[in-house]
């Protein structure tokens, strides 16, 4: 069964690009962009990105070890791209690829949220409005 058939039966497939077997010809780039492209195909209203961090941070103060979480983004500006920084050490794209995924979602007037995925019950926590960054058109 292909992904579209599964969607027709209201089955949500979990798709993960295997970095060790993906070739240049069939590579999507990373799982963040793959998720956004699939969300676009299925005209999803919302893409939930589970991450190792709570969302996009505006700044980090080395002296206080504190950072400022951006709670809402309605437009992807140069400042937002700058906040994303460079690719992460653990993954391929880090926050930069999540911003690119948000660009895809915003281009189709859909929403995206980044929230911490390694906490217990991340979707329930998101429903309770925990720390996260929402991307939506204003």
What positions do the PLM features span?
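C-terminal catalytic "cap/lid" subdomain
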Residues: 4-138
């Amino acid at each position: 069964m292909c992904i579209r058939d599964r969607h027709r039966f209201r089955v949500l497939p979990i798709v993960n690009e295997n970095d060790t077997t993906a070739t240049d010809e069939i590579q999507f780039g990373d799982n963040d962009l793959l998720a956004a492209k699939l969300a676009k195909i299925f005209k999803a209203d919302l893409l939930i990105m589970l991450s190792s961090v709570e969302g996009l941070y505006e700044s980090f103060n080395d002296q206080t070890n504190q950072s400022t979480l951006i709670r809402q983004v309605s437009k992807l500006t140069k400042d937002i791209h700058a906040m994303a920084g460079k690719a992460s050490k653990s993954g391929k794209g880090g926050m930069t690829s999540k911003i690119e995924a948000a660009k895809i979602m915003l281009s189709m007037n859909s929403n995206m949220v980044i929230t911490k995925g390694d906490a217990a019950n991340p979707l329930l926590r998101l429903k309770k409005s925990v720390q996260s960054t929402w991307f939506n058109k204003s």
